Amino acid sequence: STHGKIRIHDYVANGYVILFSHPGDFTPVCTTELAAMANYAKEFEKRGVKLLGISCDDVQSHKEWTKDIEAYKPGSKVTYPIMADPDRSAIKQLNMVDPDEKDAEGQLPSRTLHIVGPDKKVKLSFLYPSCTGRNMDEVVRAVDSLLTAAKHKVATPANWKPGECVVIAPGVSDEEAKKLFPQGFETKDLPSKKGYLRFTKV
């Protein structure tokens, strides 16, 4: 990688990692994405989340390309490592292969982003086509959702943002919910009367 040899398992350690692939260095959408990732690095760092990029280009290419990324967004620094996977073995193992995009060497990485948890398991994946850049605000929101869910035995509803109500997980009984959420919770009165949609604040 651009930071020396990295073993993904060791890099994750006991924290969260955003592992993201890009189809190629010196390409337009990827340049804007990695610049955006650099701009958001402090947001992820505040949440205890590390970043790790990967593509099939070699380390020297990554290092040269980094100059373009930083020039495109003045003030942004690419402080996270970018891994080189020239034989494409890692992207295949990580299910980051684009079925349609190829070069002379074979299939290229897709625009995939995995959020990996402390247990080394993928908690969430985004898959974008090569023509569509990622939305970093949504990546931050997804990280906040995962961290909140892991800490409080809750789930987050559609369009949720930090500070808004969350829903209590279906596996938590009302009795257990009273202990877990002494601040109380609201059960929505729906036609089915099943009492499954319970909102609370955490």
Swiss-Prot record:
GO terms for molecular function: thioredoxin-dependent peroxiredoxin activity. It is found in: Nucleus; Cytoplasm. Keywords: Antioxidant, Cytoplasm, Nucleus, Oxidoreductase, Peroxidase, Redox-active center. It holds the Pfam family AhpC-TSA. Signal peptide: none annotated. It comes from the Eukaryota. It catalyses: a hydroperoxide + [thioredoxin]-dithiol = an alcohol + [thioredoxin]-disulfide + H2O. Its main location: nucleus. Embryos. One of its GO terms (cellular component) is cytosol. The active site is at 30 (cysteine sulfenic acid (-soh) intermediate). A motif (Bipartite nuclear localization signal) lies at residues 178-201. The keyword Oxidoreductase applies. The keyword Transport does not apply. One of its GO terms (biological process) is cell redox homeostasis. Residues 1-148 form the Thioredoxin domain. Its EC number is 1.11.1.24. Belongs to the peroxiredoxin family. Prx6 subfamily. Thiol-specific peroxidase that catalyzes the reduction of hydrogen peroxide and organic hydroperoxides to water and alcohols, respectively. Seems to contribute to the inhibition of germination during stress. The active site is a conserved redox-active cysteine residue, the peroxidatic cysteine (C(P)), which makes the nucleophilic attack on the peroxide substrate. The peroxide oxidizes the C(P)-SH to cysteine sulfenic acid (C(P)-SOH), which then reacts with another cysteine residue, the resolving cysteine (C(R)), to form a disulfide bridge. The disulfide is subsequently reduced by an appropriate electron donor to complete the catalytic cycle. In this 1-Cys peroxiredoxin, no C(R) is present and C(P) instead forms a disulfide with a cysteine from another protein or with a small thiol molecule. This is Probable 1-Cys peroxiredoxin. It comes from Bromus secalinus. The lineage of its organism: Eukaryota, Viridiplantae, Streptophyta, Embryophyta, Tracheophyta.
